Amino acid sequence: MLDMKFIRENIDETERRLATRGESCTLGGFRELDQKRLALLKESEALKALRNSVSDEIARIKDKSQAQDKILQMREVSQKIKGMDDELKQVDEALQGILLTVPNLPDPATPVGKSENDNVEIRKWGTPGSYGFTPKPHWEIGEELGILDFECGAKLTGARFTLSRGAGARMERALISFMLDLHTASHGYLEVLPPFMVNRDSMTGTGQLPKFEEDLFKMTDPEYFLIPTAEVPVTNIHRGEILKKSDLPIRYAAYTPCFRREAGSYGKDTRGLIRQHQFNKVELVKFSHPSQSAEELEKLTADAEKVLQLLELPYRVMALCSADIGFSAARTYDLEVWLPGQNCYREISSCSCFGDFQARRANIRFREEEKSKPEFVHTLNGSGLAVGRTLVAILENYQQEDGSVVIPQALRPYMGGLERIQ
């Protein structure tokens, strides 16, 4: 959530920066309500000052019968004040409602652009392999090896669900353990295992609600939401808390399944594992001092890259432009892995800095000094990595002409020494 004071003092700049997202986001409603709020505050404070002054006069009158007119007058004033306070509460709630639907301001370092075509390539790692045959897409490889069963997934549930079998299921489990071991042992993250369902406050804190409710799976009695990413429960671990400056940055790594309705994705990636309603992911979440969040984003991105490097999967790092960053993000790097079976790079991780946007919504703060006023932390998160898409990348990059798939060296200890799926 944006700072109301900042918007009030910089409303034209705020609208200009929001416009770079490519959305129609005018703050006329905010401006009108904010002016009404300030007028109500001014009038209410004037009446409260009058009430205090007259109350002092009444206290000095010994014969209270001579103060009846003033007492009656102050009762009327008190009623007016109560009415104004009630109206002010309604205006504050309306302003809060507006702010909850306004996206974050792009960071000055975010490239300005109109679509994903304006994203900027930062670097590449590895060289796509050359094959003496036409590489197959992962869904063909998985079905031929009997490790991915899309038909059974559809029978059990519906479209965009998959059953993994044998070495396919084992590789998912191996990748989760490999990623968590790397991030906890080498990168300094604390592993947590959060609930896979959260309440409305948690979804609001990270920015999924109120704007993106149609993208979520939810229960109605009680009202819980299946998480679209571990970012939601892990960021909300510290909701409503004041953290110690000495504890920053706080780093968490979490494996969870993720659940997304994929509203608006009809017809996209209908085959394979790229776009599923349920998928596994290892998430990295950080709480940072504001002065260090830019540096922490670079470290977070490097931590996610390390997974791809150890698995020897070619990838590139893209800086997302202002029109392509997520609702809550101020700055984002996407890691895109090379998929020879599809002859393109596809996103496998998104690493973002949110500034104080989520912290303001979730009220996560720290103190610069022991007795100083609390300030909002900066939050960051990124996939480290999307497990299903990593499996996709392994199947396509390590496929052999005979239809088998070689297991990456780094993953073999987690696969019981298995060197090849055939």
Curated annotation (Swiss-Prot):
InterPro entries: aa-tRNA-synt_IIb, aa-tRNA-synth_II, aa-tRNA-synth_II/BPL/LPL, Ser-tRNA-ligase_type_1, Ser-tRNA-synth_1_N, SerRS_1_N_sf, SerRS_core, tRNA-bd_arm. Keywords: Aminoacyl-tRNA synthetase, ATP-binding, Cytoplasm, Ligase, Nucleotide-binding, Protein biosynthesis. GO terms for cellular component: cytoplasm. Its EC number is 6.1.1.11. Pathway: Aminoacyl-tRNA biosynthesis; selenocysteinyl-tRNA(Sec) biosynthesis; L-seryl-tRNA(Sec) from L-serine and tRNA(Sec): step 1/1. ATP binds at residues 260-262, 347-350. It comes from the Bacteria. Pfam families: Seryl_tRNA_N, tRNA-synt_2b. GO terms for molecular function: ATP binding; serine-tRNA ligase activity. It is an enzyme of class 6 (ligase). GO terms for biological process: selenocysteine biosynthetic process; seryl-tRNA aminoacylation. PANTHER family: SERINE--TRNA LIGASE (PTHR43697:SF1), SERYL-TRNA SYNTHETASE (PTHR43697). HAMAP family: Ser_tRNA_synth_type1. This is Serine--tRNA ligase. It comes from Pelobacter propionicus (strain DSM 2379 / NBRC 103807 / OttBd1). The lineage of its organism: Bacteria, Pseudomonadati, Thermodesulfobacteriota, Desulfuromonadia, Desulfuromonadales. The gene is serS.
